Amino acid sequence: MKKIGMKILSIILVMSLLIGGSSATTTASAADLGKTLENTGLGIVALIFSTLVGGLNFIVPDSKDFIKVEDRVVENFYEGTETWNDEAKADAKWSLGHAKASLVPSDWETKDYYLGGFIDPNNGMVNKVEEIIDDMQIRVIALSDGSDRGVALFANIDCIGFSNGDIKEIRKRVEAMDLGVEFNSINVSSTHTHSCIDTQGLWTNLFPKLFTNLLKSYIPFLEKERGADAEYMEFVYETAAETMKKAVEDMRSGTLTYAVKEVNDEYFNNKNRSQSTSIIDELARFVFTPDDTNYKPTMIVNIAAHPDVAGLPVDEIDNGRDLTGDYIYYLGEKIEEKGFNFMFFNGAIAGIYEGRGPAGDGVPTERRYEETLRYGYEIANMALNLTNTVEQIEANMTDAEKAKIAEEKEIGGENYTLWYEGWEPVTEKVLEPNLNILIKEVKIKVTNPLIKLVGKLNLVNYTVCKEGLDYYIFAEIGYMEIGGVKVAFMPGEIVQDLICGGGSLTADGSYSGKAFECKTIYELFGEDAICFGLMNDALGYVVPDNDYTMALLGDHYQEMISLGRYAGSTIMNGFAEIAEEIK
């Protein structure tokens, strides 16, 4: 497929050379000419794709569930804390509760379930669950600063993505429980694991459902099937709400600390968007320690890396039909082994994948999930030891851990890399009990014809709104300061340049040859801000407007799974408004 795509691109580039050759100047450098030809070719591909899919859109009627923008009613939405406190109250105290549950259905061996992440020729275009390797989990924390401004709930689900419509279903069930506390926010994020049961709908019996819903589009009285399995989603809603209830009931007072460290950037692989030049190689952790020592502390980990290794179909054994939580499961397993509860938030992960080289160590593995185990364990060891010296790290090791290192050094030889070699500890700071959250909606214009078609065919649980001939989706963005630590809530897979700046925001580095005009998260809130990605929605990829093209080839495949060319600026302008509000 890739070879065919490259041949097509080559033909298009030759055509664009013939068409545009007369406009080239003799003074243009070879690099400039190459860039011009490449962009011209990409533009032609984008035009062809948009025209073909746009034509299909034209003949497929809108879903009867689409509504006018002015008729939209906002429900099950939380704006955050009522006030923005600059400092902690005199008598304030952190309280945190934790709970987790499995989302593996009991009937998985007798009913067809589909993994969200890959439908690929290498798995025969079949992604039904055949084996459970470890687990698919939901993890929840309930957090309060004791200021009577409500409790914040955070859930993290092992899945490819969780749409805002489904998140509101969870909120509705939590609200119905009447747990005796006020919530300032109920937040749900996805790990973006590519080897757990599909919760979005794009991977569940896709092709039969696609054609069935296409036919039903022309018969008004027939209901389209939803993308994700309806019974399974009901199970997820109920399990999520019940787990949130348990987290609230588990709340107890304690202290909260924070540490962050830049780790080797080889642990993070920018695989398919080379013009986005930033790599966020920070590992951040929060640790909640209860006052009552009879209860476990809770560790919250934040890094930015796609969990897509275990689910990629490559052969008959690793065939993309095995359920696993990828590296995040093993990250949690190791941290729990050391006596902590575990919570996770992924970061800005567009184009950023697990860099398995340093964790691989030249040690042979038989299955791809074993590679994620090694990666997860290594990240966990770093998280557990951010504030420890090399001497402390070695003193805290068990005999079994020391023996394992010695054994693997022998196997890996010169390819073995000790994760803590040259390790420098960082300082952990105690966080004042002051929690501020501000969440707002942004109205994103949908320009991607493929996403319009997905909406018309009812495959994903979005509320699509119309204004004239244009389509819109409302998404949630948010900003939190937790004891002074700044956190941006991003509703999808965000290009890291939008967080900290980078090549794709510049005129020279972008497809359009123009600079991105909005400020980055670092510019708005400071370079110490971190990102919780896929939070309160899963909008697909969010790329800078100036580097957006529907060419699908090369470094622009992310645009195929994005709302459109204005998602980046709409979201960043929303954050600019938040920055103004909290001044």
Regions found by a protein language model. Give the residues of each.
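Bacterial N-terminal signal peptides that target proteins for export
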Residues: 1-12
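Hydrophobic core
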Residues: 13, 17-18
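Sec-dependent signal peptide cleavage junction
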Residues: 19-32
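Conserved beta-alpha junction segments in alpha/beta enzyme cores
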Residues: 31-189, 193-374, 387, 394-583
